[in-house]
Each structure stands twice: as C-alpha cells, then as structure tokens.
C-alpha cells in the first residue's frame, strides 16, 4: 500500500491583533482573568470583507512562496470550516479559483474544530481509493464575524486564521499511520451554531452565533482527547513514549494540561500557540503544525500525534511519521532525519 502523508504546508492569520485588555475593559473583567482561565493572551480578527475563502487563499499563497510546485497534480480541494463564505458555492471552490486551480473537485467539510483531521483522513482515503492524486486540505475560520461580542463564554476565546496542507504520496516509512474519528450528537447542545433548524434549546438560540456550555465541553474534551489519542496510538502499535510531538486542538490551556496528564505526555512535547491565536476552530492544528515545523521543533522522521475535538460533539486523532522532504516541510536550519529501516 502506498504511503500517504503531507507534502506541503502553509498558513495565514489576519493582521489585526486583539489583546485581552480590549475585552476586559469593555466587559468589566479583571485584568488577567482571561489568560488565567484560558491561556489566551491575544487573537487575530479578520478585516471587513476578509472571509474564509480569502484567508484560505492567502495560506495557500504562503505555501507556494516556499514551495512553488506544491500544487502540482492537485485534483481535489477540501476546506474544513464552520464559517464558510456562503451556504453555496463551497468555500473550497472559491479558494480553488483564487489560487488558479481549475477543473478540480472541491467541497467543504463541517465538523467544527475537528474538521482538519477529518479532512486529512478523507484525503488519504480518496487517494488510496484512486479518486484523487493529490489533495489540498484547508482548515480555517473567520469566527470573529459570527461571535456575540458581549458573550463572555465565547467572544474571548475565538480567533481567525487558516492553515493548509497538500496530501499526497510520500516515501515508505513516512506519512499517516492511523486515524480515529467519532461523534456523539447527544452532546450537540453543549456547543453549536444554530442556523436553519430550531432544534436547540428554546430561548437560547441566536442564529449564526456560537453557543457553548463550557463546563460540559471541558469534561468531554479531556476525556475524548485522551481516549482517542490512546486508541490511535494502539492502532499504530505505538505508546505515548514513542510520541515526539503532541499537537492538540488549541481550545483552552487547562484542557490541554489535563489531557496531557491523562496521556502521560509532558507539556514539553506539546505544541502550544493558543496564547497568540486563541481558538481558531478547524485552524488550530494546521497553524500549530506549521509553526512547529517552521521553527525547527518538528523535523523529518519524528512521530506526531494530533488530537482534536469540536461541535457535534466530535473528535478525531491521527498518528503520523513526519516526512520533511520538501521545502515547506522543514525549517531553514533543520534537516530531515532518515527513518530507521
């Protein structure tokens, strides 16, 4: 069986930086309260007229700046987002047009914060099944445009940004090993954005605005991050000691700390960037992956574990041996290591 993995990566975050003090002063919150409870110091908000397709295209352009051939033979685009430009056409199709991909398949995937890992799994399956050769996968959001800016439970947590990856064939010994995907709709009312159907609690619906029960989400997240990650490792014949880098969904530092304790993986092996970007939903994992590769922490031959959770309630985990053999897959100073035979 062919080895399928990531062959190129890119990212983009909007220029506007929104610091905690903007919320704390406006909401009458004590200085330092947001960071102490979430680990978030700042986040990025998109400009007026800047939507998911635009930040997606800019992430792809960043990738192309480092690897001009990254989109060669890409024949499918999947965009994981819960803040699309429109119900249709798909935001994936809009991105394809903006980056010069014509005649390719394109669709959006909505699994909230779990979306990017879900999309990686789908891309791998479609390549192995012969339906695609190379797949451009994006995970990104412009949640600032959907937030109730007076809601303490959500407004302070979310930010905007997009990461992208090309999925294709990689040398033997590298790439994706196993995936775990799951969802439980019984927990749906704990985290949702209502749209067409009035099926969530009466009196609490604000159409198009994220609504969250933080206490329930915390308990769920700690459990499923630990369980799904352990399942993925077991499917791959690995243990937590084999993991070089854990890349978790960047929702809340307390969730991450509790999950790493459940894993037995130290925080020193955990990629964290929520302090600067907040929760970008489907964008958190590709943004964290990109930064850790770009600064030289993640290098070729290292074992990665990605774990995510989101609305649905949903969850996903992925084990992967990082390749690092193309320009955007390693830092300028880092050289990819060989995988032992």
UniProtKB/Swiss-Prot annotation:
Residues 250-254 are annotated as: ACP-binding. Pfam families: ACP_syn_III, ACP_syn_III_C. It comes from the Bacteria. GO terms for molecular function: 3-oxoacyl-[acyl-carrier-protein] synthase activity; beta-ketoacyl-acyl-carrier-protein synthase III activity. CDD domains: KAS_III. Signal peptide: none annotated. Its main location: cytoplasm. It is an enzyme of class 2 (transferase). It is found in: Cytoplasm. Its EC number is 2.3.1.180. Keywords: Acyltransferase, Cytoplasm, Fatty acid biosynthesis, Fatty acid metabolism, Lipid biosynthesis, Lipid metabolism, Multifunctional enzyme, Transferase. The active site is at 113, 249, 279. Disulfide bonds: none annotated. NCBIfam families: fabH, PRK09352.1. Homodimer. This is Beta-ketoacyl-[acyl-carrier-protein] synthase III 1. It comes from Deinococcus radiodurans (strain ATCC 13939 / DSM 20539 / JCM 16871 / CCUG 27074 / LMG 4051 / NBRC 15346 / NCIMB 9279 / VKM B-1422 / R1). The gene is fabH1.
């Amino acid at each position: 069986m062919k080895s399928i993995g990531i062959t190129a990566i890119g990212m983009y975050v909007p220029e506007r930086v929104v610091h905690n003090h903007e919320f704390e002063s406006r909401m009458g919150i004590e200085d330092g309260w947001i960071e102490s409870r979430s680990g978030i110091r700042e986040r990025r908000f998109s400009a007026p007229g800047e939507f998911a397709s635009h930040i997606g295209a800019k992430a792809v352009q960043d990738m192309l700046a480092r690897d001009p051939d990254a989109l060669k033979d890409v024949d499918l685009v999947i965009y994981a987002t819960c803040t699309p430009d429109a119900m249709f056409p798909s935001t994936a199709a809009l991105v394809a047009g903006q980056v010069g991909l014509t005649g390719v398949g394109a669709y959006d995937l909505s699994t909230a914060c779990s979306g990017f890992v879900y999309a990686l799994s789908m891309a791998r399956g479609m390549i192995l099944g012969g339906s695609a050769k190379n797949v451009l996968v994006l995970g990104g959001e412009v949640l600032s445009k959907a937030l109730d800016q007076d809601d303490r439970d959500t407004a302070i947590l979310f930010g905007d940004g997009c990461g992208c990856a090309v999925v294709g064939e990689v040398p033997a010994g590298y790439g994706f090993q196993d995936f775990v995907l799951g969802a439980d709709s019984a927990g749906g009312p704990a985290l949702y954005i209502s749209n067409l159907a009035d099926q969530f609690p009466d009196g609490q619906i604000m159409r198009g605005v994220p609504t969250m029960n933080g206490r329930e989400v915390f308990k769920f997240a700690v459990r499923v991050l630990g369980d799904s990650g352990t399942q993925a490792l077991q499917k791959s014949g690995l243990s937590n000691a084999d993991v070089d880098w854990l890349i978790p969904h960047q929702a809340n530092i307390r969730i991450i700390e509790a999950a790493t304790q459940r894993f037995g993986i130290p925080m020193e092996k955990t990629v964290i960037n929520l302090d600067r970007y907040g929760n970008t939903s489907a964008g958190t994992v590709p943004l964290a992956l990109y930064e850790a590769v770009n600064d030289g922490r993640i290098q070729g031959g290292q074992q990665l574990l990605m774990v995510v959770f989101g609305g649905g309630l949903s969850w996903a985990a992925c084990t992967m041996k990082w390749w690092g053999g193309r320009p955007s897959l390693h830092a300028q100073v880092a050289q990819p290591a060989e995988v032992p035979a």
